[in-house]
Amino acid sequence: MGQKINPLGFRLGATQSHRSFWFAQPKNYSDGLQEDEKIRDCIKNYVQKEMRISSGFEGIARIGIQKRIDLIQVIIYIGFPNLLIEGRTRGIEELQSNVQKEFNSGNRRLNVVITRVAKPYGQPNILAEYIAGQLKKRVSFRKAMKKAIELTEQADTKGIQVQIAGRIDGKEIARVEWIREGRVPLQTIRAKIDHCSYMVRTIYGVLGIKIWIFVDED
């Protein structure tokens, strides 16, 4: 069996950059890692709670964290920022204070910035959320995957691969189903490929969604 390496880690320094950027002593490294996880979880929970659409569609592409001695900078790359801060002038301040309460930042100041993603349907996390929402509504998995591929056409991507694993359609035996459109050169380091793994809980159990998007080639 072929062993699949994570496409993002495989391309670090070439076409991908780190999602968290900070330095720490070896003994404090695990604390910094847990702090990052708490920040990300807190933001996702807040967005889910405050999101105005019933499907719970967050639209977060990724969350970047940069730490200095006196500052923690959190950059939220979001596909549909209007859904989060529409009609709410203090949306970001409220989110900032909410995150600050969740973890002890000490003497460091927390700064939250929201950045809009130009082509939201070219982001694997947003597509995975869309598919998860469809599966929860008991839409056929093939229909959900094909619709997600149609949405990527708006983002001018060169290729996409979608994979769903688990008890699909409530079948007793778990299986893996996938679909590919265009080129997805996983072994080419200069090929910029975005990837995400997403877990969705359905009435039949947990399903895993994986998406690879071939954006461009350097």
UniProtKB/Swiss-Prot annotation:
Instruction: List the gene name.
Output: rps3
Q: Which SUPFAM superfamilies match?
A: Prokaryotic type KH domain (KH-domain type II), Ribosomal protein S3 C-terminal domain
Q: Which Pfam families match?
A: Ribosomal_S3_C
Keyword vocabulary terms for this entry:
Chloroplast, Plastid, Ribonucleoprotein, Ribosomal protein, RNA-binding, rRNA-binding
Its primary localisation, in coarse terms, equals plastid
Instruction: Tell me how this protein assembles.
Output: Part of the 30S ribosomal subunit.
Q: Which GO terms describe its cellular component?
A: chloroplast; cytosolic small ribosomal subunit
Q: Family, per the entry?
A: Belongs to the universal ribosomal protein uS3 family.
Output the superkingdom of the source species.
Eukaryota
- Spell out the subcellular localization from the entry: Plastid, Chloroplast
Q: What is this protein called?
A: Small ribosomal subunit protein uS3c
Q: Where is the KH type-2 domain?
A: 47-118
Organism listed in the record:
Ceratophyllum demersum (Rigid hornwort)
Q: Does the keyword Plastid apply?
A: yes
Lineage here is: Eukaryota, Viridiplantae, Streptophyta, Embryophyta, Tracheophyta
